[in-house]
């Protein structure tokens, strides 16, 4: 088997390693294809279908994120058929899901002249915002597009916790904790890596959620500072998002050689202790029931 193959991307020859995906070839050609469920560090679920391309001789459009490229393949990334398919996917998403916090989808909607009002009235199962689940992040499934990134990040690709899974079919499809148990009774370790990969704001850190609710979240005003987490000796790289001299969010650069963008509960959410935590968080930590549901390693201890 040859080490490299050559195919055509929009009429241009491109050489890539054998086993590369069509998306890899598109990137090598310097072209762009839209994606929603794709993440370079996660297994492609081929769920969103917005990255589909047309392959000469193929009856159906194929997902470029997971389809393996073949020698001699001729690929069209922006044919009329491809554009119609992408437009339809975006219209269906925007007609049934709140995408107001998903600028990527809005940008694609403008690019493909999507008209979601054509499908007005349809809606996915909108599970409620579960503010009482935990004090670290909020789940708002009315914004969920079922990209499955959170499931992949929680599973064997990153965390190996397997607290999240996909459940239901059709309009009943949703992300579940497994038998719909409360989050505190699931294997969740509150690392927040599901939050980090969510493209729509369906999963959001509590500080950001509360600031958005209060109208004080101002991303253009925020500055970013890179540092190293001091909770242990691993040396994870942190990116502190600062607004009004307060840390409002912590992430990790995706190109960081230690984390690859993923953190543990202490690295992602431990910053609250720098500010003493919110009053509600302190009460929850001090409460008899909430303290037990707090992540291990961040529970408060009672003084004797």
Feature roles, as predicted:
Residues 2-19, 27, 55-57, 72-96, ...:
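N-terminal export/assembly segments and adjacent metallocofactor-ligating motifs
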Residues 13-71, 84-85:
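N-terminal cofactor/phosphate-binding cores enriched in small/glycine residues
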């Amino acid at each position: 088997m040859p080490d490299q193959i050559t195919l055509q991307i929009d009429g241009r020859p491109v050489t890539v390693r054998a086993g590369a995906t069509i998306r890899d070839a598109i990137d090598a050609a310097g072209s762009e294809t839209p994606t929603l469920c794709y993440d370079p560090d996660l297994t492609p679920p081929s769920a969103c279908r917005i990255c589909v391309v047309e392959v000469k001789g193929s009856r159906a459009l194929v997902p470029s994120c997971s389809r393996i490229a073949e020698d001699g393949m001729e690929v069209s990334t922006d044919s009329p058929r491809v554009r119609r398919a992408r437009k339809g996917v975006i219209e269906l998403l925007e007609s049934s899901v709140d995408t107001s916090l998903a600028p990527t989808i809005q940008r694609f909607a403008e690019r493909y002249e999507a008209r979601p009002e054509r499908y007005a009235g349809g809606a996915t199962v909108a599970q409620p915002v579960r503010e009482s689940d935990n004090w670290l992040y909020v789940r708002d499934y009315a914004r969920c597009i079922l990209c499955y990134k959170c499931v992949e990040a929680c599973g064997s690709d990153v965390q190996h916790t397997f607290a999240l899974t996909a459940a239901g079919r059709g309009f009943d499809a949703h992300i579940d904790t497994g038998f719909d148990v409360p989050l505190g009774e699931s294997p969740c370790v509150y690392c927040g890596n599901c939050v980090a990969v969510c493209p729509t704001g369906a999963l959001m850190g509590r500080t950001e959620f509360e600031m958005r609710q209060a109208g004080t979240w101002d991303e253009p005003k925020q500055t970013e500072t890179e540092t190293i987490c001091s909770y242990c000796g691993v040396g994870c790289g942190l990116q502190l998002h600062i607004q009004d001299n307060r840390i409002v969010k912590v992430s990790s650069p995706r190109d960081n050689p230690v984390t690859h963008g993923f953190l543990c509960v202490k690295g992602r959410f431990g910053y609250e202790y720098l500010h003493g935590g919110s009053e509600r968080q302190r009460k929850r930590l001090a409460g008899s029931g909430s303290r037990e549901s707090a992540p291990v390693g961040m529970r408060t201890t009672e003084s004797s």
